[in-house]
Amino acid sequence: MTSTRKRKKGEVPIVIPSMGRPDLLNTHKVMLPERLDICVPDSEVEKYQKAHPDLFIVGHPDSVKGISAKRQWIYETYGDVVMIDDDIGKFACLEYAVGEKSRFLDPTAATSLCDRLTEEAKQFGVYLFGVSASAVPHYYVSGLPYRTWGWVNGGFTGLIAGSKLAYNTEIASSEDYWISALNAYHHRKCLIDTRYALVDVFGNGTMKTKGGMSFTRNLERESRDIEILQRFFGDAIKRRGRMGVAHQIHEHQKMLEIPWAKMM
């Protein structure tokens, strides 16, 4: 079953990929729930509807397996779309200091951010857009509110229809690196609003929580993802050690180093 709902002009589809954890769904609490499509396998639609009768549940074929295939199905089905993780607890605005009330967006502002960035991406002529990968104030540079190159974190992935982008279903859990590198190859630029970032409710626990990517994400698959990424994109994909205040979660963490970004 696919989405047939009508949207007002200027409203981008906001899709929440989820699987196997209706009880852990949280993003609808920090956005306008009536704007969200919760995308789950067909076999789980009834379970999600029972747990969340007020939410709009969209089913995809059970044959669509893995986060890469799921994102590809969503992109092909919706076209212009913003995909947001199902475990988001807060939308942070990094222009405000820690402790300030305005640091976190209310549901209306969080939802409007998706619409605004979609329109800005179209005006700028990019196909991939997102927000900062970290809510740590240390990383925010006030003089660089937008970045036009780099890695777009999968927690907030915005795509515009008509691109040369497609997900590689061999990739188990690094699909955001794949799509960011492929975008750099084909389209050169993206749009990242560094003033905003997502805060999930579990911290760095993807491999420890149930459902979702925990079904496929483990150190062996992370290592294989790096091999696949390096096969296609060479030394633009590097293993990441301890860098500054960054916390190394596991040995197979990676980074995308776009060659021409060094000159900017």
Model-derived regions, located:
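Active-site-proximal specificity loops/subdomain of glycosyltransferases
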Residues: 39-84, 89-106
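A structural signal for short, well-ordered beta-strand segments and their strand-loop junctions
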Residues: 81-85, 127-132, 190-194, 238-240
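Short beta->alpha connector loops
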Residues: 18-23, 64-65, 161-163
